[in-house]
Regions:
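Alpha-helical transmembrane segments of multi-pass membrane proteins
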Residues: 1-163, 167-183, 188-205, 209-733
């Protein structure tokens, strides 16, 4: 643990000079400017940030993530050279240029020499790389992450198979190539053109294809192509295979095509780079099987929308009569996720008007994973009997059947309850093998279900499009017990606790920045009322801008089915168009000054009113019709959806760009409040990120929009409303 804290401290030490010196440079630039130029320069800063983001995204296609620093150093060198022409000291151009060139070369050389990237020992790829015959077949640098295709004798298809190899006359998992993303294994690929698929007979996933032969199936995730081969082996009549990750698709259709083509060239198979939401919005034929691959959820962040309540509603509506949805859930560390998936399905079916939703669900499992089957029609005795026989032959366990249909009491895979003790004593182990998931499922889907959900240690609320966090079951009210059982928390839940820690840390630094003027002459030179308004105004801007950005990125991840594209598009659109708004805030007053001369005075608040009104209208539309419009537009092409998202972000960004420069123009130039305001804005922007994440997990992203309403309303009320003479805003000679 101490080693991890030391690593975090080293990251801070490495990043501190970059951001400290950048902030110092920008603050000094503001102090050197006249009021009318603040908007233009701040706009240039924002547009430059947007352009820089595009440069970094392009560099990610060619460089290892740790070496991206090499692309930044030339930009700093160029900024230093350009600063010479505004410097208040005299230096020969060749002296200054030589100094910059020397620092540039030393910095590039030091970065290339001292950066030694390696994977953490806890990453899945670390032991795989240490195998004697390990061979890296392919490396891919991408904004999506750092991909490696690994070949060694330990790599096998990661699939849940029965242990009854002899009885079923099958072999174990076939040899495969492992695909790792940032050190985590996310998929497998066949090693050759010929693959023995007999193992599929013992697979946990294959039951729907035995139940519905000659099915039209939708595969959400292909498991590197293996799922396609397995479905064809079990006589699927038509397959639509979806992959949301473009790099997986490129590997299948590129260097590994010789191993994959016998499956994907089959006329029954259609392979698309698409997420399930947009595809189902345009498909009208319906499916007999909708099958979610077990690794799909962990392959990309945007894939989390595949297990929301609304997604399950879409799957059910896309089923033909007698059709079935097959959903995976990992129970290796927690049985709780299986309960959450059942609760999500129950609420989805209730929302669709299905009476007795438990009659449409069956749950079966191995020792490590479970499958929830959701049927279009209530399960029949024949279908339930088929599942029981399937599980008995393979030593799998049935954890839930509707209508309390009797099943074998024998448990093949012991599954103890997930129990966290508030003290040091742990509950005694049961003397016989048990199925805690069966016991909990019966309570969850019974008449006592509401009491069971309310009293459960974990939060079983379904994930939704507004709260798309399937791996989020911790209750803040149980924080003390959570810390006592920290070693038992799955990796997927750690992000919630990290956000809590980062929020506390960022609040400390933000409050430190806030009190700085009160410790020096600036606090005594400026009226307390002015200081208070400055604190409120720029803190609100820092929080509000980031809340809008984070909300739009998440909306875009669902709408585009790709978080990387959504992040890039929203970030660039907001920076560029808020930069345009900032520039307009400086241009419009000077044109008004001409109209107002010689007698007039100009009030910046007169520009803030229309900007605030436009923002309020945008927020109202985002809280109201935006979600239905996004859902309606899912069937559009990806470029059309990108255009819509970019335009929607731009409509908010232009009025947002007015607030900061207009606020700076109201601060006394003889004080140090201008750099302090810049620091406040930056510090509370940092606070906004963990705070937004925690709010989204707890109450949903809509809460951020309501907070933005409040924050920008408060900022408007705290904006100084005293007139500024046009002479004060005159240009310096």
């Amino acid at each position: 643990m101490m080693e991890q804290f030391q690593n975090i401290a080293l990251y801070y030490a490495a990043l501190f000079p970059i951001f400290f010196l950048s902030g110092l440079y920008i603050s000094l630039s503001f102090l050197a400017l006249t009021n009318e130029k603040i908007g233009a320069v701040y706009g240039a800063d924002l547009v430059g940030a947007g352009a820089g983001a595009l440069v970094m995204l392009a560099a990610m296609f060619y460089l290892h993530p740790f070496y991206l620093l090499l692309t930044l150093i030339p930009l700093w060198a160029l900024a230093a050279k350009l600063a010479q022409y505004r410097a208040r000291f005299e230096a020969h151009w060749w002296t200054w240029t030589s100094l910059i060139l020397t620092v540039f070369l030393l910095s590039e050389g030091a970065a290339a020499y001292f950066i030694k990237p390696h994977f953490c020992q806890y990453k899945m790829i670390t032991p795989a790389l240490n195998v004697g015959d390990a061979h890296i077949r392919q490396r891919i640098h991408s904004p999506y992450g750092y991909y490696m295709v690994l070949d060694n004798f330990t790599e096998r298809l990661d699939i849940d198979l029965s242990n009854n190899y002899i009885l079923l006359k099958i072999q174990g998992p076939p040899k495969a190539l492992g695909l790792y993303l940032d050190g985590n294994r996310i998929s497998s690929f066949p090693t050759g053109a010929k693959n023995d698929l007999s193992y599929a007979k013992g697979s946990l996933d294959i039951f729907p294809y035995l139940l519905n032969p000659k099915a039209r199936a939708l595969l959400i995730g292909t498991r590197g192509g293996f799922r396609v081969g397995e479905a064809l082996e079990y006589h699927a009549a038509e397959l639509v295979a979806l992959e949301s990750d473009p790099n997986i698709l490129d590997l299948i259709q590129g260097p590994l095509w010789a191993n994959e083509k016998r499956w994907f060239q089959d006329p029954r198979v259609t392979l698309l780079r698409q997420s399930p939401g947009p595809y189902l919005a345009g498909d009208k034929r319906g499916f007999d099987i909708i099958d979610l691959s077990s690794e799909y959820l962990d392959q990309a962040d945007a894939n989390k929308y595949a297990l929301t309540r609304e997604a399950l509603e879409d799957y059910w509506k896309a089923l033909n009569p007698g059709g079935v949805v097959s959903l995976p859930v990992n129970i290796r560390e927690f049985t709780v996720y299986a309960l959450k998936l059942q609760e999500t399905a129950r609420e989805a079916l209730l929302a669709l008007g299905v009476k007795d939703p438990e009659n449409h669900m069956m749950l079966y499992r191995s020792a490590w994973n479970a499958r929830l089957l959701i049927s279009k029609d209530p399960w029949t005795d024949r279908e339930m009997g088929a599942l029981k026989l399937f599980c008995v032959d393979r030593s799998f366990d049935v954890s839930f059947l509707p209508r309390l249909t009797p099943w074998s009491g024998e448990v093949y895979n012991d599954l103890p309850p997930t129990v966290w003790s508030a003290g040091d004593e742990q509950p005694a182990a049961a003397p016989d093998a048990g199925d805690a998931l069966r016991d909990d499922s019966l309570q969850l889907l019974s008449e006592r279900g509401q009491t069971f959900r309310d009293s459960h240690f974990f939060n079983l609320r379904p994930s939704t499009r507004d709260r798309p966090f399937f791996y989020s079951v911790l209750r803040l009210s149980r924080l003390q017990d959570i810390f006592k059982n920290l070693s038992q928390i799955p990796r997927e839940e750690i992000g919630y606790l990290i956000n809590l820690a980062v929020l506390g840390q960022s609040l400390f630094w933000a409050l430190l920045v806030l009190i700085l003027p009160f410790l020096g002459r600036a606090g005594r030179a400026v009226p307390w009322g002015q200081l208070g308004k400055t604190v409120v105004y720029f803190s609100c801007l820092g929080l509000g801008f980031l809340f809008i950005e984070i909300m739009l990125i998440e909306k875009g991840a669902y709408f585009l089915g790709d978080r990387t594209i959504a992040f890039s598009l929203v970030l660039c659109a907001m920076l560029v168009f808020s930069g345009l708004g900032s520039w307009l805030s400086g241009v419009i007053p000077w044109q008004l000054r001409v109209l107002l001369q010689p007698s007039g005075t100009f009030r910046p608040a007169s520009l803030l009113r229309p900007a605030g009104l436009l923002l309020a209208v945008w927020l109202g539309l985002s809280l109201g019709p935006l979600d239905p419009v996004l859902t309606h537009c899912l069937s559009l092409s990806l470029p059309s959806r990108c255009l819509f998202l970019g335009a929607w972000a731009a409509l908010a960004s232009i009025p947002l760009g007015f607030f900061f420069p207009l606020g700076l123009s109201r601060l006394p130039r003889e004080s140090s409040l201008i750099p302090w305001a810049w620091a406040l804005n930056g510090a509370f922007s940092v606070v906004a990120t963990p705070l937004a994440n925690l709010l989204a997990v707890s109450v949903g992203y809509h809460s951020l929009l309501w907070l933005v309403f409040f924050l920008y309303g408060l900022a408007y009320l705290s904006f100084p409303d005293g007139p500024v003479k046009t002479a004060v805003m005159g240009r310096r000679s």
